[in-house]
Amino acid sequence: MKPDAVTTIRSIRGNNKRSESRIVFSEVAKLPTSHGEFKVRVVKDARGSEHVIIYKGAIEDTDILDVRIHSECLTGEVFESRRCDCDQQLDWAMDYIESKGTGMVIYLRQEGRGIGLFNKIRAYALQDTGLDTVEANIELGFPSDMRSYEVAGEILHEFGISCINLITNNPRKIDALCNHGISVMRRIPILIEPNEYNRHYLNVKGDKLDHLF
């Protein structure tokens, strides 16, 4: 039941049977933004973490929905840090969805590729000494990327969505969603011009984390 009433990619269905949903949805509210008017809901997962969904259009009537799965970045999205392009990616995705009239952003609270804000700043300090973003994570004892997309898969299933076009430069998200039973029909690339502060960071994401630019 629904919770309320450009490159070709392989389509793979997850093999594991879905268990009963472990997520709880808030009510729906209007969210007027500088990108247009959206609807917003909050989702609480089994661990008590709160994630955000913003969407517009008749998503339940869309055969293949345009979706952006975006991980929290306080430094970029609140303080407009130029060390990354996270805020620009989110802006790009919201503008794209507004232009199409239908789509969804799933905003996951997994700061710093899953290591949290405290450790993200520790990693920044190591990067200031010459390590790259992957090396800094490893130096702190973390994998290069600790993010999970299980909750995103659950959210999509609860909306009755099984086929999407994914707005991303990260092919690992495609594999993760396919493993959770979501068919990714197309990858919609995000085109952001690098700046002097994040150019090396983005190059490392391409070289070591398989991002496509």
PLM regions with names:
Residues M1-F213:
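Catalytic domains of riboflavin
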